[in-house]
């Protein structure tokens, strides 16, 4: 039936053939969209990759590629991961079923636009029909970009990048299938529809946030995180913690505005909702029980396995709710790194690991947001293991939750705030200016944060514990 014919029939019938949605005077009146007079949203959506979890599942990915009918795969990793059991098992899985593949290993930790464009150029140079990412969030995000632009070779890089730097266009072609194999218990990128990159010229980060870039399959194998170095485990764990806390305390979906005119453009960062709450809260429970164990005893397989599970769960949570101030304020910190402040990471450039930059302002951020939704902050503190009564005051809730966060930082011996990473009070104006570009994050903070407030949050984060 043609669109014009359908419109003609509906016009003659009065719009709707359902008597339950039409007034008595006209049983064929088209029902209006629910709550059409409101400016805020009224619905939420669930977007997630298929997730496979279990020890040894990396060896199954060859069958997954074959089941897709793919003939030539691009395997993307970085030079450190290339020496791990995760990468070796991924290669073995492809060889077992005779899948033709090539390897791209020139991925930058904390990727930039330029480093992503190298991967994109390689992906475009040959007729790959599927992609596999083996690595942490930097590798997975880079692979998302490579697969997206290889599927849309005519697009300019900024076409799919979000505001304020990109055009936020919808791609003409769907992304070629991507299988993500995470090697850190951290970013949750294996389940999300976002890819983040650094913009050095703007001294901040930006991202691609499109439903079509979520991986076809997330293969989450605990064997792949058992060899994580101590600082990688700490900082990726901080990322999990903030993903869960930020998504659980985000502005509720039905308080977010504007309402989308078309459901196809409903933002990925849609605000906290009943589905994201389940995943975020369970991630917090796991973190409260296993985070310290996973750091202080790296041979504790149960703790490392559970933290990997928390990473994926928090990814599902924030992938459907969003993150707010911790992430929004983190991007200028890591983008403007003055030195390499962490062992266990490559030293080829100044580097502040993403998880550390996110955690640096967390205490100030949650002190600020507690009053906006004290019940959410109370539940967060309790779920992390704090003994706090349900009738606690806002001040007590804030202090208890933030003491938990300080405790992790102090116990793990990480740099103490912005000063511990080489920043001074004189840098706050520059950080604040760059943070103003983190529009999608700051927009779903449960409490509105203007430039003056952001500056204050940075100032309070100069020293944390």
From Swiss-Prot:
Its biological purpose: Catalyzes the cofactor-independent reversible oxidation of gamma-hydroxybutyrate (GHB) to succinic semialdehyde (SSA) coupled to reduction of 2-ketoglutarate (2-KG) to D-2-hydroxyglutarate (D-2-HG). L-3-hydroxybutyrate (L-3-OHB) is also a substrate for HOT when using 2-KG as hydrogen acceptor, resulting in the formation of D-2-HG.
Which family is annotated? Answer: Belongs to the iron-containing alcohol dehydrogenase family. Hydroxyacid-oxoacid transhydrogenase subfamily.
InterPro entries for the chain: ADH_Fe/GldA, ADH_Fe_C, ADH_Fe_CS, Alcohol_dehydrogenase_Fe, HOT
Its protein name is Hydroxyacid-oxoacid transhydrogenase, mitochondrial
Q: Which GO terms describe its cellular component?
A: mitochondrion
Chief subcellular location: mitochondrion
Provenance organism: Caenorhabditis elegans
GO annotations under biological process? glutamate catabolic process via 2-hydroxyglutarate
């Amino acid at each position: 039936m043609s669109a014009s014919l359908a419109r003609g029939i509906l016009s003659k019938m009065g719009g709707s053939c359902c008597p339950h949605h039409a007034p008595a005077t006209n049983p064929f009146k088209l029902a209006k969209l629910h709550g059409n007079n409101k400016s805020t949203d009224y619905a939420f959506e669930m977007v997630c990759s298929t997730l496979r979890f279990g020890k040894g599942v990396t060896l199954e990915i060859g069958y997954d590629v074959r089941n897709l009918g793919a003939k030539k795969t691009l395997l993307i990793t970085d030079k450190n991961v290339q020496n791990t059991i995760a990468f070796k098992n991924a290669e073995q899985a492809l060889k077992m079923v005779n899948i033709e593949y090539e390897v791209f290993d020139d991925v930058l930790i904390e990727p930039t636009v330029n480093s992503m464009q190298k991967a994109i150029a390689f992906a475009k140079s040959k007729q790959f029909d599927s992609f596999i990412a083996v690595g942490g969030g930097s590798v997975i995000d880079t692979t998302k970009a490579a697969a997206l632009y290889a599927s849309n070779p005519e697009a300019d890089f900024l076409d799919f990048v979000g505001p304020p730097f990109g055009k936020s266009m919808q791609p003409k072609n769907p992304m070629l299938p991507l299988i993500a194999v995470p090697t850190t218990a951290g970013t949750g990128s294996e389940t999300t529809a976002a890819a983040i990159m650094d913009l050095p010229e703007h001294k901040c980060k930006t991202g691609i946030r499109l439903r079509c870039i979520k991986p076809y399959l997330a293969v989450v194998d605990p064997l792949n995180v058992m060899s994580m170095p101590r600082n990688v485990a700490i900082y990726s764990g901080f990322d999990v913690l903030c993903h869960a806390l930020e998504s659980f305390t985000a502005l509720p979906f039905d308080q977010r505005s504007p309402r989308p005119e078309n459901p196809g453009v409903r933002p990925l960062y849609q605000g906290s909702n009943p589905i994201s709450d389940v995943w975020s809260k369970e991630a917090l429970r796991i973190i409260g029980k296993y985070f310290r164990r996973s750091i202080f005893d790296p041979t504790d397989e149960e703790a490392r396995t559970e933290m990997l599970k928390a990473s994926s769960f928090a990814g599902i949570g924030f992938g459907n709710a969003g993150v707010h101030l911790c992430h929004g304020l983190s991007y200028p910190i890591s983008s403007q790194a003055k030195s390499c402040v962490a062992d266990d990471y490559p030293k080829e450039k100044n580097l502040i690991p993403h998880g550390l930059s996110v955690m640096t302002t967390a205490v100030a951020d949650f002190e600020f947001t507690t009053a906006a939704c004290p019940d959410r902050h109370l539940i967060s503190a309790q779920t992390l293991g704090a003994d706090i009564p349900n009738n606690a005051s806002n001040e007590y809730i804030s202090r208890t939750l933030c003491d938990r966060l300080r405790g992790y930082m102090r116990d793990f011996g990480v740099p103490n705030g912005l000063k511990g990473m080489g920043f001074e009070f004189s840098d706050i104006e520059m950080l604040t200016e760059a943070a103003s570009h983190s529009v999608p994050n700051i927009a779903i903070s449960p409490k509105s944060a203007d430039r003056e407030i952001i500056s204050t949050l940075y100032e309070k984060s100069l020293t944390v514990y």
